[in-house]
Amino acid sequence: MSQRKFFGTDGIRGKVGADQMTPELALKLGWAAGRVLARTGTKKVIIGKDTRISGYMFESALEAGFSSAGLNVLLMGPMPTPAVAYLTRTFRAEAGVVISASHNPYYDNGIKFFSNDGSKLDDEIELAIEAELEKPLICAESQFLGKVSRIDDARGRYIEYCKGNFPADQTLSGLKIVVDCAHGATYHIAPAVFRELGAEVVAIGVEPNGMNINDKCGATSMGAIRDKVLEVNADLGIALDGDGDRIMMVTQEGDIIDGDQILYILALDAKERGLLKGGVVGTQMANLGLELALKDEGIPFARSKVGDRYVMELLKELGWRIGGENSGHILNLDHGTTGDGIVAGILVLAAMRRSGKGLQQLIAKLKMFPQVLVNVRFEGDKNPLEADTVTAKVAEVERELGERGRVLLRKSGTEPLLRVMVEGEDKETVTRLANAIADAVKAAT
């Protein structure tokens, strides 16, 4: 495969005004993508965004680029990433575009694409777009320019889609739920979804100002929702990230429920209903406790590289339907084509209603193992992963842990860091062993 210059594993992302995230690039990207997408299909593209102040700028630039290439543009305004994927399918658009940096701070932004079926763009199309980016921008003749319009009912369409994932014969009546929207794209969606299903909703993180997205709130900062759940004596809390593709939850007692625990709930619910097709895909960072608990239930488990793109690839390869990351990206291919925080929350609530159990009860048999992560900075060209002393230390630690523990070493993709992760049943033992490996890494650099 050719080397990518712009696209990463999840589109293009960076600090606004620096890196690659400039209005100039967005304009050219819209034109280049338009040139590729206009070769076939409906010549129609959808653009959605989160609530970052820079979204206006990038939306206008992309809009101009697509129009100059002859594509018609449908604008959604602030909408969750999974909503763009869904509406791209229902509008029969050639592609969907999301302007978001997901869980990052407001001063970052990004651009990612969905294909006409709501999945991530194929590598071949991304490479074709990159090839067009190298060419000079040539505007289409006036009679072939694209038009721009707005989808006025995008919010209502997506709310109804989300509600459709909950059993029609059930309601959430009697449940008090705190919903934290991270001042992001779900601020006008998620509270309405759960209210219309019958829950009493206490909404926080629903006052975006362009600069407070993910700021001490949402799925990456659980303190605010935990405090609110305890303050109002809610039955549970649902925290989403800035673009709505991640979910974390909080029990009535204030315990944090992460993506691994949500996967466990969804897998057991699907198994009990005879709907589990195969097993569950997690990542290299998935807790060993999840793997062992699923094994006890006779459910196969497979690990992919970190990143929802790789989870999706392995799901398709194995023909399975449920997968995700401990960070809260949850994929259920029977209910969508991408990670959807609101829908994942609805599926957990449906499992609660069917079982008659509370959130804490649903994970009672899942024993999460302590994980210790140590970041070791290294300099120079040496790869500490190849050092004999490091390899020997890892082997020694793995022997001590046996089948009830795990070691993972991986290099950061953005910094000169080696991440040492050790997990096992005892926190003190795991900490000691992680530090021992970290010391071996330091000595080898």
Swiss-Prot record:
Annotated family: Belongs to the phosphohexose mutase family.
Name of protein: Phosphoglucosamine mutase 1
PTM characteristics: Activated by phosphorylation.
Enzyme Commission designation: 5.4.2.10
GO (cellular component) term, any one: cytosol
GO biological process, one term: carbohydrate metabolic process
Names of the cofactor(s): Mg(2+)
UniProt entry tagged with the keyword tRNA-binding: no
